[in-house]
Curated annotation (Swiss-Prot):
InterPro entries: Restrct_endonuc_II_XamI
EC numbers on record: 3.1.21.4
Broad class of enzyme this protein falls into: hydrolase
Keywords: Endonuclease, Hydrolase, Nuclease, Restriction system
Catalytic activity from the UniProt record: Endonucleolytic cleavage of DNA to give specific double-stranded fragments with terminal 5'-phosphates
Gene Ontology biological process terms in this record: DNA restriction-modification system
Organism: Streptomyces albus G
Protein name: Type II restriction enzyme SalI
Record-level Gene Ontology MF annotations: DNA binding; type II site-specific deoxyribonuclease activity
Lineage, broadest ranks: Bacteria, Bacillati, Actinomycetota, Actinomycetes, Kitasatosporales
Gene: salIR
Length: 315
């Protein structure tokens, strides 16, 4: 085992991990937020243009530009969460989620889609924040200063709503980049292994990121794994090393999410047997309670602040 059987080291590792995460956050998170905020400002500006400064929120606009819906939700008083808009419009959550990814559901009939969009537009128009959009009730053109202020407020709301994912995604990219750098320095090659091929046929000395791994027998499904590594000298069972990159900015969130990896390792072992393992790559606020739970579920981990433990993991 790597760290799961060494509880005497856990407290020191937790403290070191928290320090590393906090330093990264202070150094990098503001830039990640600023970069995303600029993209958000651009999205809001486009939404203003498409809706004639929020005076024409129509199904046609949403059909042509589904992703605009996220900006419109932040233009109401109060700003509306996804589920709240679904409830108020008696709509479809899957439709809303698909639209905010920039797409429309291909299998939904046209008349059904039109009905849903019309209801959404009615709710958004009724709840439009008139303290921001002074020009809406009067029918007068928006003054440049009023328009700029409204766009800034909506952009701040939208960016604030996605602040946590911004930071989490930036941290995940950084963690995978560290793993890649470590592997390349040891002669590994980055090469995708198709989910349609048996997992134990992965080429030795290769690795891939965000790879789908098949689980289940009667009803096979793909589950995503952050990093899959086949050592230069594979294990006798030929199964690669599976790694999940995990980061957390507070202790509360990790305790809420700790069952996710336990479920994943159980799915993997049902499919591939007890030989397969899932290693966590941890940075941030993972306390001894989280570690004890993970160890009891058959999980092991490598700390980012001691990345060379990947060797002990088999890489």
């Amino acid at each position: 085992m790597i760290n799961a059987d060494k509880p005497h080291r856990w407290n020191d590792d937790v403290q070191a991990s928290v320090r590393l995460y906090n330093q990264w956050f202070l150094d990098a998170a503001p830039k990640a937020y600023r970069d995303t905020r600029q993209l958000t400002i651009d999205e809001v500006e486009q939404a203003f243009q498409r809706t004639a400064n929020m005076t024409s929120i129509t199904p046609e606009v949403l059909k042509a530009h589904p992703k605009t819906l996220a900006t419109l939700r932040m233009s109401t008083a109060p700003p509306i969460a996804r589920d709240r808009l679904v409830g108020l419009s008696h709509g479809s959550k899957s439709l809303l989620d698909t639209m905010e990814k920039g797409k429309l559901p291909p299998r939904m009939k046209g008349d059904v889609l039109d009905t849903h969009l019309a209801k959404m537009c009615a709710v958004l128009t009724d709840l439009l924040d008139l303290d921001l959009f002074h020009w809406y009730p009067t029918g007068e053109p928006a003054e440049p200063r009023q328009r700029e202020l409204a766009a800034t407020v909506v952009a701040d709301r939208l960016c604030g709503a996605i602040a946590d994912p911004i930071v989490r995604n930036a941290q995940e990219r950084r963690q995978l980049a560290l793993i890649e750098e470590w592997l390349l320095a040891r002669g590994y090659t980055k090469k995708t292994h198709s989910a349609s091929l048996p997992l134990n046929t992965m080429q030795p000395g290769t690795f891939s990121f965000r790879q789908n791994v098949v689980v289940g027998s009667d009803l096979p499904v793909n589950i995503p794994v952050d990093a899959v590594i086949q050592p230069h000298t594979p294990h006798s069972h030929k199964l690669p090393i599976l790694i999940e990159a995990k980061s957390a900015g507070d202790f509360t969130n990790t305790n809420k999410r700790r069952k996710e990896e336990a479920t994943k390792i159980h799915q993997l072992q049902l499919k591939y047997g007890n030989e397969i393992s899932l290693t966590l790559f941890l940075c941030g606020y993972f306390n001894t309670g989280y570690l004890g739970y993970s160890a009891a579920e058959g999980l092991d981990w490598v700390w980012e602040h001691r990345i060379d433990d990947l060797e002990a993991a088999g890489a």
